[in-house]
Amino acid sequence: VVRTLDTLGRILTDFGNEVLYITPNEFRSVPLPSYPEIRLSLMPNRKVAKMINDFQPDAIHIATEGPIGRATRRFCKRRGYPFTTSFHTRFAEYANERWKVPTSWGYGILKDFHKDGETMMVATPGLVSELKERGFTNMKLWARGVDLEQFTPGDRSLLDKHERPVFLYVGRLAVEKSIEDFLEADLPGTKVIVGDGPQREELEAKYKDAVFTGPKYGDELTKYYQASDVFVFPSRTDTFGLVNVEALACGVPVAAYP
């Protein structure tokens, strides 16, 4: 999601637009319980209102349903400003996986959050159909793409030191990504895990035969895609999974849920 929004901002800037991101970095924040990488902003309402007033935007897009997103939504509704939203993350499934909150409750909260926007942007036609069945309305497809100058087939030698075939995962190491389903699978060759997250220490200790590289970025990340034999994406909670497209662009077959 971060990379998608960063790319969007760069493209908008290239077209002569000014872009303001309102993020938790601008506020006092606390870590989300059991998920410290996600920061929850404390009492953002007043500062959000000031930032928007000072910037005087022509368009407002709310990308998350957390405290900043809610503060922005509240500000827009009070002022009568139109805004759009996007559905990036299956928080209902995340909450069920981590805290056993019924998914129906989670989707009820999400549906209420998104209903007042001009439109809700969704990543895939399948997700549009699913959310429509759950009662969401006024959705538009917002497809994703990757930089084909960066992600392209190339030199495969980086992972030659490992027994092939090499099965690669790239992404956050967290329980909702179902990485253990991949690590438990009886597969030949080597499993390589690129990324970081709250589950990393536990997974490294439990699965000694897997190779954990930590996070990789830019050209270095591309080289891992290029050198692998199969990309594996075991998550059932992602709305899109941009890493799948990155792997395909590098000429690597993908094993994932439809």
Residue ranges and their predicted role:
Residues 107-154, 213:
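Donor nucleotide-sugar binding/catalytic pocket of nucleotide-sugar-dependent glycosyltransferases
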Residues 82-84, 93-112, 122:
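Nucleotide-sugar donor phosphate/pyrophosphate-binding loop at the beta->alpha transition
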Residues 253-256:
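Short hydrophobic beta-strand element within catalytic cores of glycosyltransferases
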Residues 200-219:
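Nucleotide-activated donor-binding/catalytic signature segment of Leloir-type glycosyltransferases, i.e.
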